Amino acid sequence: MTKYFDINQPGYSIKCKIMGENIRELKKVILYCHGFGGHKDTKAAEHFAEAALSKMKKTAILIFDWPSHGNDVRSKLTLEDCDTYLSIVLEYIHNTLHVDDVCAYGTSFGGYLIMKYLHDHDSNPFRKIALRCPAVSMYDIIYQRVMTDENKTMLTKGKDIQTGFDRKVLIDQSFLDELKSEDIRHWDYLDFADDIMIIHGTKDEIVPFNEVKEFTENNVIEFVPIEDADHRFQNLDKMKLAHSYMIEFFKS
């Protein structure tokens, strides 16, 4: 069963999608946090749901559009809005779905936002966290690998820019300044490390493999390299392998 719905609070309307057999009898929710320029209908989430729901009963996969992504109505992306969206969705899972066992699957920008959330709130709302190709160096990735020279010129003139890959996102200089100052590589995650696993492709062309490996070593986080996988894990067999590791981790 797949259901689309909105979580509405004053000033916010978060576009969500939930996949599961019987949403009224849930014991576990895995919150999928997509990457920069992504959306709630990402194929990776569907592949994961298909594999996970066949192995975990009374479980649902919930995915939502980050601010300024997918069908979200916010015009410009801010880290503050991302934090608020994640808080609202977590509140919905606990208070409306009445589920206490919440895990997280974050990819790329979504992985960055999950780790930022742990630091900013000094707590972990998830029983387990599995990240695929997390953008630990988010500022460098946006500025060096995503933005065009024209984007950079427009920013110097005080203009907002549309940037991204397949789908563009509206950002401004203040967003970049925030990313630069909110560098998760400078923060300590040792208190949360036992409940985190990071999977990364050795051929990731967006998020440098060695940067993520170093991040996991510094924080004693379980690290699973996938040979020859790119950033999006476009090879379905490699995606299935990554998901198999995640599913066992979430079941533990």
Description of each model-found segment:
Residues M1-I23:
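N-terminal cap/lid segment of alpha/beta-hydrolase-fold proteins
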Residues G106-I114:
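Gly/Ala-rich beta-loop-alpha elbow adjacent to hydrolase catalytic centers
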Residues P67-V99:
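Catalytic nucleophile-loop/oxyanion-hole region of alpha/beta-hydrolase
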Residues L26-G35:
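Short beta-strand element of the alpha/beta-hydrolase
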Residues H34-H39, T202:
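Active-site glycine-rich loops that stabilize anionic/oxyanionic intermediates
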Residues A49-N71:
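Conserved alpha/beta-hydrolase
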Residues L77, Y112, N124-F215, N219-P225, ...:
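The alpha/beta-hydrolase serine catalytic core
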Residues G37-E50, N210:
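The serine-hydrolase catalytic nucleophile loop
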